[in-house]
Regions:
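Helix-rich "cap/lid" substructures immediately adjacent to catalytic or cofactor-binding pockets
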Residues: 2-104
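Alpha/beta catalytic cores of group-transfer enzymes, especially the acyltransferase/condensing modules
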Residues: 11, 38-56, 116-158
Length: 162
């Protein structure tokens, strides 16, 4: 029998509607969105629904991931949306009996891999990722960028703008 591995993507692969078919089809996925929303109600959304509704800021995981909004591409929100979607799909696969022998993730995806490995409780993972997104947004506000340059240092200096 073949070995199965789960691979989780990092930030950058998000889009409005990601995971919606899973959410609308499988109770296991819906439960993950509800759990994430419950954790965030206590941590961030708190009792701000009216203020957030007026400002346009998302006040539920469903609104953030399924309704058209600019926040899906803002790190503060992107990370919790990605993890919620990853864990929702993971729970559906597990309910169908598809168990992985290993899991790996790129950057943010490492937390999806932690969920797959069962090493942390989901509410804790949601709290950690929500705060990670906030801190990363504060450290690198909108408009920042990153690049990876492979090669000798002497070449790197020649290719970077001064």
């Amino acid at each position: 029998m073949s070995k199965i591995a789960y691979l989780f993507p990092g930030q950058g692969s998000q889009y409005i509607g990601m995971g919606k078919e899973f959410h609308d089809t499988y109770p296991e996925a819906q439960a993950v969105w509800k759990l994430a929303d419950k954790v965030l109600q206590n941590l961030y959304w708190q009792d701000k629904r009216e203020v957030q509704a007026e400002s346009g800021h998302p006040y539920s995981m469903e609104q953030l991931t399924f309704e058209e909004n600019p926040y899906i591409n803002i790190t503060e929100y992107t990370q919790i949306a990605m993890l919620t979607m990853e864990v929702a799909i993971l729970k559906v696969l597990e309910a169908k009996g598809l168990k992985a022998e290993m899991a790996a993730g790129l950057s943010l995806g490492e937390y999806g891999a932690l969920a797959a490995a069962g090493v942390m409780e989901l509410p804790d993972l949601f709290r950690i990722i929500r705060m990670r997104g906030i801190y990363m947004q504060e450290a690198y506000p909108e408009g920042g960028a990153m690049t990876a340059v492979l090669g000798p240092v002497s070449y790197t200096h020649l290719t970077l703008p001064t």
